[in-house]
């Protein structure tokens, strides 16, 4: 019977711990090196083989000298944020040296307290999409010799009739290319008149049914005209540049990067990231267009949108510009739970390797994750955010190392990687439910205060 298998694992016990460790051994979450202490019918004493850890594993804080009780402050901070209505719920994940040692959910999907947040539920990552979809594909282009970050945009797109062709990709990625911060594209698709104080969608641009003319699903029962994504790109193409070449965070470059990526590889952005990264990394929950992959009750809702879509946004991207591209954009649109996002972050932490596969060269990753223009008081790397320069604001607590990198999202999210401490911190929430004007999560410093607690216990070597 045993000869029918390539390998057999002997776990000795049928306990919960033994089952979990055996599963991790099979999938490479832990390495094994045990041998048989006695002979059996099919195997002699000392038979065994060694395997190595190749994927994120699951451990406990005690492996690093921290008891679960020590982490009560994280629970307190999360629950206090929920009590103060900074967010209805959240997910928090900590990984240390390749082991997920903390992965918990708090609160509910909404303030009606009907559906508890589960660790498999997904959040709208907002701008974390930039570093989890656009950036890995841009780094792939660099590795393949299809992109030089010091190229001008004109090397990749026909922009001859505008002033955008001379913009340098490195400057765009570091947010100092003079592009505007954002453009509210949706406003030009609304009628001037209102009904009961609510703006009305132009019937020449929207329909309630999908068709060849109206293929882009913006939200439930709202489809945008096929020509409008080109109108968005044209608006960016001819938008006015800022006068000074200084740091100014901008989404607009990622609309441009999406077009470059899709032109280069002749495929849609969601297919590119799925085929080249998410599927290969074993992600079951992460990706664009979550309603095509899971039940709506696993998707955390964001805003009750009164300005544009006149509905609760659930299963559709919150960002209006991304929604006008059918939910797939370079700057927003990816949904995930903390566990899947951690796999991508671990790949970054492993210098581009995961599960014995290389995704990005270490040289490219090193270039993309280092400060680019600190002399301009610009803390950004290429796409990634970094620790603040000389304590001047920023997205992190003060304990992160200078080598660390990550990104935040408007919906109330952060994913951060710290190579010096082999540490990953992820916080996901829907702080904009039901109103994007809710700034309590930001003003209460919830993400950074929890991050500081993580570093208090796991920031050592």
Regions found by a protein language model. Name each.
Residues 404, 411-424:
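Short, surface-exposed beta-strand/loop micro-motifs that present aromatic residues
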Residues 84-91, 113-174, 240-253, 329-332:
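Short active-site loop at a secondary-structure junction
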Residues 36-45, 50-52, 67, 350, ...:
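Short, gly/Ser/Thr-rich active-site loops of penicillin-recognizing serine hydrolases
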Residues 65-125, 146-148, 319, 436-437:
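Short, conserved catalytic-motif segment at the N-terminal edge
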Residues 1-65:
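C-terminal non-catalytic regions of proteins with extracellular/luminal or membrane-system context
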Residues 10, 91-93, 171-173, 287, ...:
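Structural recognition of the beta-strand scaffold that forms the well-ordered cores
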Residues 166-402:
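Short, surface-exposed loop or secondary-structure junction motifs
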Residues 103-106, 182-188, 288-289, 428, ...:
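Short, solvent-exposed loop/turn and secondary-structure capping segments
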């Amino acid at each position: 019977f045993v000869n029918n298998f390539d390998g057999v694992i002997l776990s000795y016990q049928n306990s919960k711990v033994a089952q979990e460790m055996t599963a991790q051994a099979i999938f490479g979450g832990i390495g094994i090196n045990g041998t048989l202490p006695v002979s059996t019918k099919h195997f002699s004493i000392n038979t065994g083989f060694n395997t190595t850890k190749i994927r994120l594993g699951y451990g406990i804080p005690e492996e690093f000298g921290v008891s679960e009780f020590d982490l009560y402050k994280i629970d307190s901070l999360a629950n206090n944020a929920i009590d103060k209505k900074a967010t209805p719920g959240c997910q928090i994940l900590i990984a240390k040296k390749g082991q997920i040692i903390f992965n918990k959910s708090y609160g509910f999907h909404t303030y009606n307290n009907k559906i508890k947040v589960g660790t498999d539920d997904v959040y709208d990552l907002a701008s974390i999409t930039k570093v989890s979809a656009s950036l890995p594909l841009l780094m792939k282009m660099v590795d393949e010799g299809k992109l030089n970050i010091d190229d001008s945009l004109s090397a990749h797109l026909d922009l001859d009739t505008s002033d955008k062709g001379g913009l340098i990709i490195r400057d765009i990625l570091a947010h100092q290319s003079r592009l505007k911060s954002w453009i509210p594209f949706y406003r030009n698709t609304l009628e001037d008149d209102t009904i009961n104080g609510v703006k009305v969608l132009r019937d020449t641009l929207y329909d309630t049914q999908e068709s060849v003319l109206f293929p882009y699903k913006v939200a439930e029962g709202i489809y945008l005209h096929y020509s409008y994504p080109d109108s968005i790109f044209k608006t960016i193409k001819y938008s006015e540049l800022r006068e000074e070449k200084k740091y100014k965070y901008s989404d607009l470059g990622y609309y441009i990067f999406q077009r470059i990526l899709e032109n280069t590889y002749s495929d849609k952005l969601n297919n590119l990231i799925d085929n080249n990264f998410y599927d290969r990394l074993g992600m079951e929950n992460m990706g664009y267009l979550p309603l095509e992959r899971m039940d709506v009750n696993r998707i955390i809702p964001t805003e009750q949108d009164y300005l544009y879509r006149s509905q609760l946004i659930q299963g559709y991207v919150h960002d209006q510009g991304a929604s006008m591209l059918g939910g797939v954009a370079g700057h927003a649109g990816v949904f995930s739970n903390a566990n899947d996002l951690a796999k991508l972050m671990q790949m970054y932490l492993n210098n581009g390797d995961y599960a014995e596969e290389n995704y990005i060269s270490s040289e490219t990753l090193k270039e993309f994750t280092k400060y680019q223009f600190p002399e301009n008081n610009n803390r950004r790397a290429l796409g990634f955010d970094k620790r603040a320069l000389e304590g001047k604001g920023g997205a992190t607590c003060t304990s992160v190392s200078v080598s660390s990198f990550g990104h935040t999202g408007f919906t109330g999210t952060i994913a951060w990687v710290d190579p010096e401490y082999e540490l990953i911190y992820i916080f996901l929430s829907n702080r904009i439910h039901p109103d994007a004007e809710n700034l309590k999560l930001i003003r209460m410093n919830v993400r950074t205060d929890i991050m500081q607690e993580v570093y208090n216990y796991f920031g050592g070597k």
